[in-house]
Regions:
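Short, hydrophobic/aliphatic alpha-helical segments
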Residues: 257-269, 443-446, 484, 649-651
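Intrinsically disordered or highly flexible coil/loop and linker segments, enriched in small
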Residues: 38, 42, 46-53, 69-86, ...
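Active-site-proximal, well-structured secondary-structure segments within enzyme catalytic domains
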Residues: 132, 136-137, 165-168, 175, ...
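C-terminal, non-catalytic "cap/extension" segments appended to globular domains
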Residues: 2-28, 35, 195, 215-217, ...
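Short pre-active-site segment immediately N-terminal to the catalytic Zn-binding motif
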Residues: 451-469
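Short, hydrophobic/amphipathic alpha-helical patches that form generic packing surfaces
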Residues: 68-79, 138, 142, 243, ...
Length: 680
């Protein structure tokens, strides 16, 4: 292919230099990736062979600025692998991932390059670098050491080989799970669908139609699975679907992940040992706000002690209602939890998620969320149809700062489709950085899987989907407000256990009447959401909160159990899992189910030895939001301080220093316990 036909290899000529999705074809990736690797290798050679003595500028900054083309291509390719993939893309990923992994390993294990970095690092006292420069030097040096640069001979070769294996296995893990999820469908009759709300019935009928079939079909995608477990009256069907979901990747087929996770855990442990750490968790936590596994266990155990009594009460109350309905010998099982919890929630609060949906029409919610950002930070959003998008469902917005200057591009991608992974996430198509005095602004995307509009009805969100929107939008603000010199430290490039603070703090607004009143209107009548309905949302927001907390703690304990190991694992995965999280489990365990084989966060995502960070960030966000509560939830001074001290700073300083500058104190679990009604 000629270079002038490949959009990656020439100027984009698009608004704000956004990715030219309309021009990119599958055949463009491979040549652009290969050229990107070649270019970066040439840039690295130029650094290594520079006859001048190593300096911060000619070595550290030169390395930071290398690989621009490769970055451009891998960003689009990596993001579309999640949002708009195909069999061809997945085949190409299998082909290119080992090459890309080898390429980055070649850089991080380049001895001459590291010698120059080390030479600069050893002069750091004389150099007296300040702020971001000092941080970049430390981060670069640590990054190389943590990538095996201090290793020699066989150890270095082993490290390289293990990393390549890891990249292949994580990809296989994710693809197995995606294929297993996509392969499941269950056709249901009208009778079997009793109890399910109208919105789900329409969605299941639409799924069948999309697959060219009659009737109704449910799948294991969240918008299909979650309401089914919550509302389906047929207990045996709930059990069947629960088992299908919770035994994914355990079956005797090509998508089984049992051996893969053993290899993943063992390889990560071996990598940590090579670098002189006793466990993989110790290696990971060195670059975390928590710093040690003791600190993680301390948090998980503090929360476990605080929430267990309340969680036991919650389960007893749900079981009591189930027995009232089904008879005294009824035993509550995991496939009953969502169903009877929903019944109890309705009884206690007379609040049905479905009666909220009409007030949360997607475009109104979007206006509300954008409006919140305008009110807090003065920023505005304007759709620009000239900006190319990768799918017709996607919209692109220009975001302007309060002084009218251009701040960022924001893409929104709201609905499920084939080729898009489940869940919700924020990502960047371009980071922010400052070069020669020019502030190059970011391109940020939020991707969800909200129920689609269906026959005659717009997309109506559940309350938890409104929370999800706020959450991902919080990450987007972190990306859009980035204001740092170096792209590798901008936006969400922060310690993992700090990255969820900007997202989770936004969720606090979902139960604030003042915020809901700004946008929640009935999509047919235009009626504002009634005050008593808002009060019910507030009252219900802590419903079964302790049980939910224990569930998160159990995932945190499971994660730590896998990654605090000091010896190779070749045991029974299910038995190990059961033991790891038993003190946080209240409902009976179910034979054959297994979480670990589908726990993407810790096996294939960035949360290995990091799942605790959701709770860590919850402690932070409750503590931080208590300042908004104290000063007024739309207080622009508090918002300006949050933007200045947290959102704009990225990873340029230790997060505890940033947090204390905003909050004036270290965080404590007190605000979270109070918010959850565990203490008064």
């Amino acid at each position: 292919m000629t270079e002038n036909k490949n959009p990656f290899l020439k100027p984009y000529n698009t608004p704000h230099d956004t990715a030219p999705f309309h021009l990119i074809k599958i055949e463009h990736y491979e040549p652009a990736l290969l050229k990107g690797m070649k270019e970066q290798n040439e840039e690295i050679d130029a650094i290594v062979n520079n006859p001048e003595a190593p300096t911060f500028q000619n070595t550290i900054v030169a390395l930071e600025n290398s690989g621009a083309l490769l970055d451009r291509v891998t960003t689009v390719f990596g993001n579309l692998m999640s949002a708009e993939t195909s069999d061809e893309m997945q085949e190409l990923a299998e082909k290119m991932m080992p090459l890309l992994s080898e390429h980055s390993n070649n850089i991080s294990l380049n001895e001459k390059l590291f010698a120059r970095i080390k030479a600069v690092y050893e002069q750091k006292d004389q150099l007296q670098l300040k702020g971001e420069d000092a941080q970049l030097l430390q981060k670069t040096y640590d990054g190389f050491v943590r990538s095996g640069a201090n290793l020699t001979g066989e150890a270095k070769e082993k490290f390289r080989q293990l990393n390549t294996e890891l990249s292949i296995l994580t990809l296989r893990f994710s693809q197995n799970l995606l294929k297993e999820t996509n392969n499941y469908e269950l056709a249901l009759t009208k009778k079997q669908l009793e109890g399910l709300p109208e919105s789900s019935l329409e969605s299941y009928a639409q799924t069948a139609k999309d697959k060219g079939k009659e009737g109704s079909i449910i799948t294991l995608d969240a918008p299909s699975f979650v309401p089914f477990m919550k509302y389906c009256d047929d207990r045996s069907l709930r059990r069947e679907v629960y088992m299908a979901y919770n035994t994914q990747c355990t079956h005797n087929n090509e998508y089984n992940n049992v051996d893969i996770i053993k290899q993943l855990v063992n390889i990560r442990m071996e990598l940590a040992h090579l670098l002189g750490f006793s466990t993989f968790a110790e290696y990971k936590l060195k670059k975390r706000m928590a710093e040690t596994s003791d600190a993680v266990y301390k948090l998980l155990n503090q929360l476990l002690d605080a929430y267990t009594p309340a969680a036991l009460k919650e389960v007893a109350e749900v079981e009591a209602l189930a027995r009232e309905m089904e008879g005294n010998d009824f035993q509550l099982m995991p496939w009953d939890w969502a169903y009877y919890s929903e019944k109890l929630k309705n009884k206690k609060f007379n609040l049905n998620e479905e009666e909220l949906r009409p007030y949360f029409e997607l475009s109104q919610v979007e206006k509300g969320v954008f409006g919140l950002a305008t009110r807090l930070y003065g920023i505005t959003f304007k759709e620009n149809k000239e900006i190319p998008v990768y799918h017709p469902d996607v919209k692109a917005y220009e975001v302007f700062d309060k002084d009218g200057s251009f701040l960022a591009v924001l893409y929104t991608d709201f609905h499920p489709r084939a080729g898009k992974r489940s869940g919700a996430w924020m990502t960047s198509y371009k980071e922010q950085w400052i070069e020669n005095g020019v502030n190059s602004r970011p391109h940020v995307s939020v991707t969800m899987n909200f129920t689609k509009p269906s026959a005659g009805k717009p997309a109506l969100l559940t309350f938890s989907e409104v929370n999800t929107f706020l959450h991902e939008f919080g990450h987007a603000l972190h990306g859009m407000f980035a204001n740092t010199t170096y792209s590798t430290m901008s936006g969400t490039s922060v310690y993992w256990d700090f990255v969820e603070l900007p997202s989770q703090i936004m969720e606090n607004f979902a139960t604030e009447k003042e915020f809901l009143n700004t946008f929640a209107r009935h999509y047919q009548t235009g009626e504002p959401i009634p005050a008593e309905l808002i009060q019910k949302i507030v009252d219900a927001s802590n419903f079964n909160v302790a049980y939910a907390c224990l569930r998160q703690i159990s995932f945190g304990l499971l994660d730590m159990a896998w990654y605090t190991r000091q010896e190779t694992f070749d045991g029974d995965v299910r038995a190990y899992e059961k033991e790891a999280w038993k003190k946080a489990q209240i409902l009976p365990g179910v034979e054959d189910t297994c979480m670990s084989v589908q726990f993407s966060h810790i096996m294939a995502g960035g949360y290995s030895a990091g799942y605790y960070s959701y709770k860590w960030a919850e402690v932070l966000d409750a503590d931080a939001f208590s300042l908004f509560k104290e000063k007024g939830i739309f207080n622009q001074e508090v918002a300006a301080s949050f933007r200045e001290n947290i959102l704009s700073k990225g990873g340029t300083e230790h997060p505890m220093a940033l947090y204390k500058r905003f909050r004036g104190q270290e965080p404590s679990i007190h605000a979270l316990l109070k918010r959850n009604g565990i203490i008064n």
